[in-house]
């Protein structure tokens, strides 16, 4: 289908005439679902921003005002809150699919995707703080203070982010502005991610990404993606029946700078990294391990000599990695006591061991199977 308009031609190339492998499975739908959820979050978040006041004395009460006084404000708040969890569910599925099918061989796609992941984690953390509840306030204190480990400039950076010597209303305004602006930067990188992906074509379940036996994306796959409707219906129903099951009870208590919660726990999608941070008693080493738990995957783009002899081994290692990540997430929400303090370092070691084992094996695969 030939279209003269350049913009429509670009969209047509993305959604209609895109050459797609005949062997794609439903796991290739995670990316399109992520795009829809991102737009959904931007729309609901913009509505909430109309009524939110980034002030330390009014932030918590304006959230309650949105819930009880604004027409359908509770719907937007609940959908935005649970939409973040839906986004991270598909984001982790998308990443694990990429590891499973070795998508890191598409270097630009992989690097841009990981950058999106890091920015989304920052975005979610700042949105978590905006509620200005007891748990989110102390999470902001703990996480931002980790930047003090940066040599020379660390304490200055922390003071700059806090806009003073502690987390205050100025910090809240800083986070609100960034939380509002960052999604637009994420959208730009997502566009670059799509351009990089569609310039080469994605990998397939046969571990190849050449122009072999391909079909147009529409109507073959556009029709198959209709199961997204079921996902959205489930999301709406579960959000209305269990609106705050993925949250913490401390999020219904207004922030009190004079009294910290008994047990500080971040949102579930940060728990694996939080468990790794707590597993190391040294602050500097803990922060380095926290960063490396994500940054390590940038090095997977160095893999360029893949051999098909290792597909079964790769599947096994990825499954083990998923299991270790899940256990770390469970340990992250447990209290700091035995046996959890013993298990956290153990599974942190397994997490990094599996990641670097995959990296080493696939980087040296051609040498191993000459």
Curated annotation (Swiss-Prot):
- Give the subcellular location: Mitochondrion inner membrane
Q: Indicate the transmembrane segments per the record.
A: 30-50, 74-96, 109-129, 175-195, 221-240, 284-304, 316-336, 342-362
Summary of subunit composition and partner proteins: The main subunits of complex b-c1 are: cytochrome b, cytochrome c1 and the Rieske protein.
- Annotated Pfam families: Cytochrom_B_C, Cytochrome_B
What does this protein's UniProt record list under function? Component of the ubiquinol-cytochrome c reductase complex (complex III or cytochrome b-c1 complex) that is part of the mitochondrial respiratory chain. The b-c1 complex mediates electron transfer from ubiquinol to cytochrome c. Contributes to the generation of a proton gradient across the mitochondrial membrane that is then used for ATP synthesis.
Its required cofactor(s), as named, are:
heme b
Q: Which family does it belong to?
A: Belongs to the cytochrome b family.
- Where are the coiled-coil regions? none
Query: What is a biological process (GO) this protein takes part in?
Result: proton transmembrane transport
Q: Which InterPro entries match?
A: Cyt_b/b6_C (IPR005798), Cyt_b/b6_C_sf (IPR036150), Cyt_b/b6_N (IPR005797), Cytb/b6-like_sf (IPR027387), Cytochrome_b_N_euk/bac (IPR048259), Di-haem_cyt_TM (IPR016174)
Q: What else is known?
A: Heme 1 (or BL or b562) is low-potential and absorbs at about 562 nm, and heme 2 (or BH or b566) is high-potential and absorbs at about 566 nm.
Q: Which residues bind a ubiquinone?
A: 198
Q: What is the effect of changing residue 288 to V?
A: In strain: AB1, AB2, CB4852, CB4853, CB4855, CB4857, CB4858, KR314 and PB306
Keywords on this record?
Electron transport, Heme, Iron, Membrane, Metal-binding, Mitochondrion, Mitochondrion inner membrane, Respiratory chain, Transmembrane, Transmembrane helix, Transport, Ubiquinone
Question: What is a single molecular function from GO for this protein?
Answer: oxidoreductase activity
Query: Where does the chain bind heme b b566?
Result: 94, 193
Would I find Transmembrane helix among this entry's keywords? Answer: yes
* Main location class: mitochondrion
Please indicate if the UniProt record lists Transmembrane as a keyword.
Answer: yes
State the species of origin.
Caenorhabditis elegans
- What is this protein's name? Cytochrome b
Provide a GO CC annotation, any one: mitochondrial inner membrane
| Gene3D superfamilies with a match to the protein in the record | Cytochrome Bc1 Complex, Chain C
């Amino acid at each position: 289908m030939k279209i003269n308009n350049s913009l429509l031609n670009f969209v047509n190339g993305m959604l209609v005439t895109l050459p797609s492998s005949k062997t794609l499975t439903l796991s290739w739908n995670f990316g399109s679902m992520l795009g829809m959820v991102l737009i959904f979050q931007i729309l609901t978040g913009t509505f909430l921003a109309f009524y939110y006041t980034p002030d330390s004395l009014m932030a918590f009460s304006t959230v309650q005002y949105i819930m009880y006084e604004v027409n359908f404000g509770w719907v937007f708040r609940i959908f935005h809150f649970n939409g973040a969890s839906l986004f991270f569910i598909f984001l982790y599925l998308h990443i694990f699919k990429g590891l499973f099918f070795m998508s890191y061989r598409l270097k630009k796609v992989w690097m841009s995707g990981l950058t999106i992941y890091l920015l989304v984690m920052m975005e979610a953390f700042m949105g978590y703080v905006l509620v200005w509840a007891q748990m989110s306030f102390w999470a902001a204190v703990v996480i931002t203070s980790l930047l003090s480990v940066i040599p020379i400039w660390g304490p200055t950076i922390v003071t700059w982010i806090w806009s003073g010597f502690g987390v205050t209303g100025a910090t809240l305004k800083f986070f609100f502005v960034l939380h509002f602006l960052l999604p637009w930067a994420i959208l730009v990188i997502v566009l670059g991610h799509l351009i990089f992906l569609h310039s080469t074509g994605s990998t397939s379940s046969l571990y190849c990404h050449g122009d072999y036996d391909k079909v147009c994306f529409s109507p073959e796959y556009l029709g198959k993606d209709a199961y997204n409707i079921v996902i959205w219906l489930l999301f709406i129903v579960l959000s209305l029946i269990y609106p705050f099951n993925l949250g913490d009870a401390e999020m219904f208590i207004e922030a009190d700078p004079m009294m910290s919660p008994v047990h500080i726990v971040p949102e579930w999608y940060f728990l694996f990294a939080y468990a790794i941070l707590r597993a190391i008693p040294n602050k500097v080493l803990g922060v380095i391990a926290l960063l490396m738990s994500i940054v390590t995957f940038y090095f997977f783009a160095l893999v360029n000599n893949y051999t098909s002899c290792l597909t079964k081994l790769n599947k096994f290692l990825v499954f083990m990695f998923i299991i270790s990540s899940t256990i770390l997430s469970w340990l992250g929400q447990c209290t700091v006591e035995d046996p959890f303090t013993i298990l956290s370092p153990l599974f942190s070691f397994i997490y990094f061991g599996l990641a670097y084992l995959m990296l080493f094996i696939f980087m040296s695969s051609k040498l191993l199977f000459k």
